Amino acid sequence: MRFAATVSEKQSEQSVEVTEEFAVTMTEKRSCVHFDKYVDLDKLLKIIKSYQQIKCGECNERVHVKRGSRWGASNRRDWYSSSDQNCARNAIWLCLECGYYVCGDVGLPTEAQSHVMGHNRLTRHRLVIQCKNPQLRWCFSCQSLLPFDNEENGEKKDLLLEVVKLIRERSPNTYSASFETEFSCSGSIYGGIEARDGYAVRGLVNLGNTCFFNSVMQNLLSLDQLREHFLKEDLSVSGPLVSSLKELFAESNSEASVFRNEINPRDLFFSVCSQAPQFRGYQQHDSHELLRCLLDGLSIEESSLRKKLGVSDSNDSSTYQKPTLIDSVFGGEISSTVSCLECGHFSKVYEPFMDLSLPVPSMKLPPKKQQILSQAKEVLKNGAVSKDSEVVSAKPASDHNSTVPLFPSDHKIQSRPETSDNETDLVLLSDVSDTAPSTEAKGVNQILVGSTETLMHDNDRTGKTVPDKEDVRATQSNEETSASGISAVIDEAQVCGCPDLEQSSSSANQGADEELALMVADSQVLYMPYKDHLFYDDYMVAEASSSFVSGDHEPKKDYFDFSSFLDEPEIREGPVFRPLSKSEVYEAGFKADCSDDKTVSAGKGEASSSFISSDHEQNIDYVDFSSFFDEPEISERPFFRPLSKSEVSEAGFKADCSDDKTVSAGKGEASSSFVSSDHEQNIDYVDFSSFFDEPEISERPFFRPLSKSEVSEAGFMAVSGNDKTVRAGKGETFSSFMSGDNERNIDYVEFTNRIFDDRGTSERPVFGPPSKAKVSEAGFVAVSSDSDPAVLDESDSPVSVDRCLAQFTKHEILSEDNAWHCENCSKNLKLQRLREKRRTKEGLSNRWVNENGASSAFDECRDSSLNQSCIDLENGYKAAPPITKLPNCKEEESAIDDGFVGEENTKQAPITSVTETPLLGGETISSQPASDNECENWEDLAVDSEEVIVKRDARKKVLINKAPPVLTIHLKRFSQDARGRVSKLSGHVDFQEFIDLSKYMDTRCSEEDEPVYRLAGLVEHLGAMSRGHYVSYIRGGHKERRDSDTKEPNSSIWYHASDSQVRPASLEEVLRSEAYILFYERI
């Protein structure tokens, strides 16, 4: 811990080894007045001679000091105790005023916790000299180096020459050997500054979110080839980028940055921004993009300068040009070979590269299992809620202050004592009372136990209470009945867009009948809340609905067969549905508040359907929807017709009617009447065959059947209010079930099979909204996220740079849309067509030869229009246009027989010159062309001019043909999806200090030197996309030492640079980092 604190203090100090020439330059500018005043050379020489060895006096007195000594141990323990263990790592300094040896920094003695600083604080002695490097002579008061010599009689003489000789005689090996070893391994903060040609690691000032720029520049400044070029070459005539980069290299050199902790790269950054304006401002950018823009700018600038100066390294007839500096340092070449799998023809292309961008193997995280679905599955499997269990009690809905919190504020599930022992978050209600007498006189026979309306927008969540049975009876005199539903507890961390969850209460909504769908499975009631104005994507336009009609005498329990919710795909037959009162009827989101003698007009060309609620007798109409997608036949069974699309709103239509009031319909439309009477019934039959012009699109709402895989992926949570409708997906049907005394059941199995046969979905439907919450504003909340984070794919082996290179250079099969245009196969197809053409031409000419052995050119010209048909008859195939893909271009004859090839409208060649042949009667006719070769060549050219493209499956392989001096490897950690969202692939990718590219090189490569590289630096990105930071690791030290220690794995000195902060780092720390860009130098 003490050593870590010492290292951290060094980050803000200026300690460095200075060469003799530069120290002279610095001391000429600064003269110290304290040397002549406080240094007594004779006294100092005597003290130095009295010491036999050079050791730190404080470290030695740690063992032998007495309490009554000159400064007292108690006064020194606050500063020397933390540095005793590191004395062997530090240099020894001699106080020029008292001759006392103390240990301190390797560079300048400015570390606060060092013994030399403690000696200065206690004694106020100002002047010290370093024993290992006597050129370092420091004055604490002036904060500068002392002059080496003084001019006397026109000659320069070193005033401390005798002192330096005595110091070198005092057993210098006693400390220098151990110091060299410890210093090389410890990685002091300025250990890289060892000689005039060594690289001095300095921090770079952050100009405002420019860490992406600083991290790249730290690595470029550490590259030996670039530094030698910019420091030694004469670049007086250059562009702004080259000039500013040269100045930055000069400032970072150890000879020019002794007294500077950091460098301001303002000029270079502004030069880059002038050519790449996207880096302006104070926003974060990609460091790899900055690197490419900088290197391209330097290369373009150098090429432009060559053209202006007229520099040419080649003749006019040669296209060779001397590569630029960037091309010679970073430029490499890859070979891309594509070979046809059919004929073996291959093509090789050489492409230059500045860096290798390697894709990192990754995989998507599996979606989190949602708590509500897993618990519901357990309930349905184990039957946790018994048949005789009571309904969960709640306060009346009329009490506005009472709430049943859907999401408790303490993030814990509220206990419900009415449920069974195997209690879950999903509350299942059972045993709804068969009879619920009503005080309302207009046929309302049963009140729904209740449903919770929870409308969830991004930050808005409300909940409605569940009314008790007797409290509901007490409130039935009102025109409206409050509705409530299930309370589903979902992990708040998985709910998207709802960071704050509040409890609220709601009461009955005046002027609207509120009712929710009720589903029952084996005496277990599951309330499924829904709402009507829910819109999904454009492809989800078909809708369906569920309507219920109730009678008075023996109301049935309505339920959906929900046994296959998450279990085996069993579908029960003969569902019974809960009867609803007249005021509670909803058809496709349609809401009719009607009393006796109310009439609602129907859509265009449609019939009507009437509902009758009686105290003595009831006849229930229902819809046979088994043939929904069959031929448009007229249904023989009466059902209730929803209005046309023009009469409904987006979620369904809502017709509010009063007594003796009729809503006019469209042209040619019938009406639907609702009559409430004690003795009479009137049933209308509806022709539903022409309701939809396109039967695959339906706009009637329903709970869309979802497969188990869809539910497990994102799940559903339908939280909506009364009179709300859920839209379904495209091509989906709806269900319209009714129940009453004279109940006629629909074949549920047939109905669901038709749905899934037409949609091609799973056989295990789960009724609910779609799995993705694409309309969270409508009330649906998805538990899973669309952008799941990606992780490194370590299923086969740990991810490493070698594995990425192997993935980059492995064979790739090009097929289907990516099939390769094989020139050899295209040429063979042309030749095949030419041969076939000549073969048919020869057969045709032999057929028309006359008896004298001379062919009749006249007959040939006369019958030229029939040649094509004759060819077709002889060869047995019709002429076809050029085929782009053949199964085998080698087997020519089989291709012809199979009809894969043909020729286009072959025309007879024009007769350019003819010979006069005397015939009977002295007449002459044109004979064969004088030049048959000319005619044939014309036809051959016509065939050759046809553009024939044959695409074949091919194999592609990419290898490195030329290895660059500096290999830059870019790991693709950032990706962008189709929606433009950028994500980061976090995780450690294994890499080594040395890398060999031999197995990734092209076998025809003629390079003699082995492509072995050593790590020179890297760029690492920390954090996430929104709040990230770039840092860099740089290999420092003397160039000659680095070159001589290439075979030693731990001989490097590494530094960690984060903008202006620079600290030493070990090689183990470097290899543990999550590298983004790697820089390797060839050895």
From Swiss-Prot:
<dbReference type="GO" id="GO:0006508">
    <property type="term" value="P:proteolysis"/>
</dbReference>
<dbReference type="InterPro" id="IPR050164">
    <property type="entry name" value="Peptidase_C19"/>
</dbReference>
<feature type="binding site">
    <location>
        <position position="142"/>
    </location>
    <ligand>
        <name>Zn(2+) 1</name>
    </ligand>
</feature>
<dbReference type="GO" id="GO:0016579">
    <property type="term" value="P:protein deubiquitination"/>
</dbReference>
<feature type="binding site">
    <location>
        <position position="95"/>
    </location>
    <ligand>
        <name>Zn(2+) 3</name>
    </ligand>
</feature>
<dbReference type="GO" id="GO:0008270">
    <property type="term" value="F:zinc ion binding"/>
</dbReference>
<protein>
    <recommendedName>
        <fullName>Ubiquitin carboxyl-terminal hydrolase 1</fullName>
        <ecNumber>3.4.19.12</ecNumber>
    </recommendedName>
</protein>
<feature type="binding site">
    <location>
        <position position="125"/>
    </location>
    <ligand>
        <name>Zn(2+) 3</name>
    </ligand>
</feature>
<feature type="binding site">
    <location>
        <position position="119"/>
    </location>
    <ligand>
        <name>Zn(2+) 3</name>
    </ligand>
</feature>
<dbReference type="Pfam" id="PF02148">
    <property type="entry name" value="zf-UBP"/>
</dbReference>
<dbReference type="InterPro" id="IPR013083">
    <property type="entry name" value="Znf_RING/FYVE/PHD"/>
</dbReference>
<feature type="binding site">
    <location>
        <position position="98"/>
    </location>
    <ligand>
        <name>Zn(2+) 3</name>
    </ligand>
</feature>
<feature type="binding site">
    <location>
        <position position="139"/>
    </location>
    <ligand>
        <name>Zn(2+) 1</name>
    </ligand>
</feature>
<keyword id="KW-0378">Hydrolase</keyword>
<feature type="binding site">
    <location>
        <position position="115"/>
    </location>
    <ligand>
        <name>Zn(2+) 2</name>
    </ligand>
</feature>
<keyword id="KW-0479">Metal-binding</keyword>
<dbReference type="InterPro" id="IPR038765">
    <property type="entry name" value="Papain-like_cys_pep_sf"/>
</dbReference>
<keyword id="KW-0862">Zinc</keyword>
<comment type="similarity">
    <text>Belongs to the peptidase C19 family.</text>
</comment>
<feature type="compositionally biased region" description="Basic and acidic residues">
    <location>
        <begin position="455"/>
        <end position="473"/>
    </location>
</feature>
<feature type="binding site">
    <location>
        <position position="56"/>
    </location>
    <ligand>
        <name>Zn(2+) 2</name>
    </ligand>
</feature>
<dbReference type="GO" id="GO:0004843">
    <property type="term" value="F:cysteine-type deubiquitinase activity"/>
</dbReference>
<feature type="compositionally biased region" description="Basic and acidic residues">
    <location>
        <begin position="409"/>
        <end position="419"/>
    </location>
</feature>
<feature type="compositionally biased region" description="Polar residues">
    <location>
        <begin position="474"/>
        <end position="485"/>
    </location>
</feature>
<feature type="binding site">
    <location>
        <position position="32"/>
    </location>
    <ligand>
        <name>Zn(2+) 1</name>
    </ligand>
</feature>
<feature type="binding site">
    <location>
        <position position="34"/>
    </location>
    <ligand>
        <name>Zn(2+) 1</name>
    </ligand>
</feature>
<comment type="function">
    <text>Recognizes and hydrolyzes the peptide bond at the C-terminal Gly of ubiquitin. Involved in the processing of poly-ubiquitin precursors as well as that of ubiquitinated proteins. Is involved in resistance to the arginine analog canavanine (CAN).</text>
</comment>
<feature type="binding site">
    <location>
        <position position="103"/>
    </location>
    <ligand>
        <name>Zn(2+) 2</name>
    </ligand>
</feature>
<dbReference type="InterPro" id="IPR001394">
    <property type="entry name" value="Peptidase_C19_UCH"/>
</dbReference>
<feature type="zinc finger region" description="UBP-type">
    <location>
        <begin position="30"/>
        <end position="165"/>
    </location>
</feature>
<dbReference type="InterPro" id="IPR001607">
    <property type="entry name" value="Znf_UBP"/>
</dbReference>
<dbReference type="InterPro" id="IPR028889">
    <property type="entry name" value="USP_dom"/>
</dbReference>
<feature type="active site" description="Nucleophile">
    <location>
        <position position="211"/>
    </location>
</feature>
<feature type="active site" description="Proton acceptor">
    <location>
        <position position="1029"/>
    </location>
</feature>
<keyword id="KW-0863">Zinc-finger</keyword>
<dbReference type="Pfam" id="PF00443">
    <property type="entry name" value="UCH"/>
</dbReference>
<feature type="domain" description="USP">
    <location>
        <begin position="202"/>
        <end position="1083"/>
    </location>
</feature>
<keyword id="KW-0645">Protease</keyword>
<feature type="binding site">
    <location>
        <position position="59"/>
    </location>
    <ligand>
        <name>Zn(2+) 2</name>
    </ligand>
</feature>
<dbReference type="InterPro" id="IPR018200">
    <property type="entry name" value="USP_CS"/>
</dbReference>
<feature type="region of interest" description="Disordered">
    <location>
        <begin position="450"/>
        <end position="486"/>
    </location>
</feature>
<feature type="region of interest" description="Disordered">
    <location>
        <begin position="387"/>
        <end position="424"/>
    </location>
</feature>
